[in-house]
Swiss-Prot record:
Free-text tissue specificity from the UniProt record: Expressed in salivary glands.
Organism field: Dipetalogaster maximus (Blood-sucking bug)
SUPFAM superfamilies: Lipocalins
InterPro entries linked: Calycin, Triabi/Procalin
Name assigned to this protein: Dipetalodipin
Localisation: Secreted
Keywords: Disulfide bond, Hemostasis impairing toxin, Platelet aggregation inhibiting toxin, Secreted, Signal, Toxin, Vasoactive, Vasoconstrictor
GO cellular component assignments: extracellular region
Any single Pfam family the record assigns to this protein: Triabin
């Protein structure tokens, strides 16, 4: 009987931890000074994100304390709904290219707070990045990998190469090409 209970308990633990997000390693060429000099990018593709057509843009500024602040603007096609998140990004200690993100809805009632970990898994530090996000808190937030690009209309060859290096196909990802980003 003890063996059966132990096996059930182990199975429950394995199932619970199987859903945890393990942050992927950051790109070896990541350079925070160059990377955060790019103030505005578009999410052009999402591996696990919603299928609906949304335009998501990131605007980032450097802070004097070596953290960065990012404003994430999400606009559904047709401009019917806009969601703005204000995030403070702090580098993970001793890990280049990985960050803790604490995001809130500015001017909100204090009810929405989302915490994430992020890892820049591929980048050229100026035109594109693949970023892996793992939720720490936040209902409805799922693990995702997104393509960030300065050019919303074309896929940078570096993106294609990085996706291929991971054994993925961009054709299987959700494109934001027809989302109507301005």
């Amino acid at each position: 009987m003890k063996t059966i209970i132990a096996a059930i308990f182990l199975g429950i633990l394995m199932h619970a931890f199987a859903k945890e997000c393990t942050l992927m390693a950051a790109a070896s060429n990541f350079n925070s000074d160059k990377y955060f000099d790019v103030p505005h990018v578009y999410v052009t593709h999402s591996k696990n994100g919603p299928k609906e057509k949304v335009c998501r843009e990131y605007n980032t500024t450097k802070n004097s304390d070596k953290t960065t602040s990012t404003t994430v603007v999400t606009l559904k096609t047709g401009g019917t709904q806009s969601i703005v998140l204000s995030c403070n990004n702090s580098p993970k200690s001793g890990v280049k290219g990985q960050y803790f993100m604490d995001c809130q809805v500015p001017g909100g009632t204090g009810g929405i707070n989302i915490q994430l970990e992020s890892s820049i898994i591929a980048t050229d530090n100026k035109n594109y990045a693949l970023v892996h996000f793992c939720p720490i808190t936040g209902r409805g937030v799922t693990e995702d990998i997104v393509v960030l690009q300065t050019n919303k209309d074309n896929v940078d060859p570096g993106v294609t190469s990085a996706i291929k290096n991971y054994g993925w196909s961009l054709e299987n990802w959700k494109s934001r090409k027809d989302a109507g980003c301005q």
